[in-house]
């Protein structure tokens, strides 16, 4: 069967794109702008030492942003019903990527983890693709098998079985942080899709026990747990990264040292422009700056949840579940990243979405957010169409009444 571009894309006009939720767009733009600023500031020292220029990573991040927006506009032209049709294919494709990343010569190893596939322009992190594709697949599954999920244990367990297959490959990389985010998002979607509460509680308990067992199965994870409990017990070795992050918070106090004035980014805090960029942000902009950034995330996520809710109420369940899934993915990563940065959670290799340096995370996250924008546009078009039909129906009724009176 020949597939043409018009079978995949349904371009939107400028008038349609102007209908996207303004608060969602403005909060996203603000977060992206702060992300570029913080990557530029936090990466100065490491950029100088590695590339002999202070703004190498900022330049790369701007390139990733351009690629992400371009990819996002492409996703914006795809009707959500097409994504629903391709859910199984996308899930299988992401599974193939997780397998490929483990193949020597294809997968790229960084800091002891084999998580990336070199695409020349940037390194593709397979787990980022897998998380988004699983949201698309599970959203479609909840529509196709709605009754089974609500009434049948097998219907509830099937997506969890597929997720466990993903987790096996993720843990082989290893990528424990992505595993936690993925299983948490899938469980949350099943609950939103109507899974019985007792099944939901049982699977949450099981997931917690499994993750706890996995956390204790590797010596480096046990060390991270011990450092999380008391980083000051060994502040110059295993507890070094967290203790330096906490020092950054102490320096920042309420109002911060000022943009660009961080001390911890000067080779004291490892991964200052990636996993621990939030610590540098608070050091420079203070606790109030941290609250502002988290408030922007809260605003953006609340609008995504609202868009998803409108889709569900408008009899568009796939689009609604997908929005909820994307929002939960981002929310989980924000909570874990900030929790790690502040010492409330054990150290994991998770970036702060849209803020931390990195191509895969930024490009894939922007792609998912442009899909949310498509859902919002389709919601409004469907609502307008419904209103037109209602007006036409009332007009026809009035004509019929007039003819009856005549």
Curated annotation (Swiss-Prot):
It comes from the Bacteria. It is found in: Cell inner membrane. It is a multi-pass membrane protein. InterPro entries: FtsW, FtsW/RodA. One of its GO terms (cellular component) is cell division site. Pathway: Cell wall biogenesis; peptidoglycan biosynthesis. It catalyses: [GlcNAc-(1->4)-Mur2Ac(oyl-L-Ala-gamma-D-Glu-L-Lys-D-Ala-D-Ala)](n)-di-trans,octa-cis-undecaprenyl diphosphate + beta-D-GlcNAc-(1->4)-Mur2Ac(oyl-L-Ala-gamma-D-Glu-L-Lys-D-Ala-D-Ala)-di-trans,octa-cis-undecaprenyl diphosphate = [GlcNAc-(1->4)-Mur2Ac(oyl-L-Ala-gamma-D-Glu-L-Lys-D-Ala-D-Ala)](n+1)-di-trans,octa-cis-undecaprenyl diphosphate + di-trans,octa-cis-undecaprenyl diphosphate + H(+). The keyword Plastid does not apply. Keywords: Cell cycle, Cell division, Cell inner membrane, Cell membrane, Cell shape, Cell wall biogenesis/degradation, Glycosyltransferase, Membrane, Peptidoglycan synthesis, Transferase, Transmembrane, Transmembrane helix. Residues 383-406 are annotated as: Disordered. The chain crosses the membrane at residues 22-42, 56-76, 86-106, 116-136, 153-173, 186-206, 280-300, 318-338, 352-372. Its EC number is 2.4.99.28. Its main location: membrane. It is an enzyme of class 2 (transferase). Peptidoglycan polymerase that is essential for cell division. This is Probable peptidoglycan glycosyltransferase FtsW. The lineage of its organism: Bacteria, Pseudomonadati, Pseudomonadota, Gammaproteobacteria, Oceanospirillales.
């Amino acid at each position: 069967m020949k597939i043409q571009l018009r079978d995949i894309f349904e371009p939107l006009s400028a008038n349609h794109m102007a209908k996207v939720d303004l608060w969602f767009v403005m909060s996203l733009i603000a977060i992206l702008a702060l992300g570029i600023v913080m990557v530029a500031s936090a990466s100065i020292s490491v950029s100088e030492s590695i590339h002999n220029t202070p703004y190498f990573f900022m330049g790369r991040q701007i390139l990733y942003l351009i690629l992400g927006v371009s990819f996002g506009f492409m996703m914006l032209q795809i009707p959500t019903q097409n994504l629903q049709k391709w859910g199984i294919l996308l899930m299988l494709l992401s599974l193939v990527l997780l397998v490929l990343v483990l193949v020597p010569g294809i997968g790229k190893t960084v800091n002891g983890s084999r998580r990336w596939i070199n695409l020349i322009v940037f390194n593709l992190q397979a787990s980022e693709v897998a998380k988004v594709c699983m949201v698309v697949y599970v959203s479609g599954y909840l529509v196709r098998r709605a009754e089974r999920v609500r009434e049948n244990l097998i219907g509830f367990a099937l997506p969890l079985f597929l997720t466990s297959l993903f987790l096996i490959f993720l843990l082989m990389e290893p990528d424990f942080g992505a595993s936690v985010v993925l299983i948490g998002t899938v469980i949350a979607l099943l609950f939103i899709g109507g899974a019985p509460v007792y099944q939901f509680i049982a699977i949450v308990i099981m997931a917690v026990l499994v993750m706890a067992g996995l956390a204790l199965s590797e010596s480096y994870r046990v060390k991270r747990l011990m450092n999380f409990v008391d980083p000051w017990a060994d502040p110059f070795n295993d507890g070094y990264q967290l203790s330096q992050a906490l020092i950054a918070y102490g320096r920042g106090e309420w109002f911060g040292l000022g943009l660009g004035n961080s001390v911890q980014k000067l080779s004291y805090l490892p991964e200052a422009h990636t996993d621990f960029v939030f610590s540098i942000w608070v050091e420079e902009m203070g606790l109030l700056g941290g609250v502002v950034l988290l408030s922007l995330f809260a605003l953006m996520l609340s609008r995504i949840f609202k868009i998803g809710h409108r889709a569900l109420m408008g009899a568009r369940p796939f689009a609604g579940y997908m929005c909820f899934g994307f929002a939960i993915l981002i929310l989980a990563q924000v909570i874990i990243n900030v929790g790690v940065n502040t010492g409330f959670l054990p150290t994991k290799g998770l970036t702060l979405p849209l803020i931390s340096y990195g191509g895969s995370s930024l490009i894939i996250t922007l792609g998912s957010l442009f899909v949310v924008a498509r859902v919002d546009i389709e919601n409004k078009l469907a609502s307008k169409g419904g209103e037109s039909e209602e007006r036409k129906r009332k007009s026809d009724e009035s004509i019929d009444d007039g003819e009856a009176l005549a």
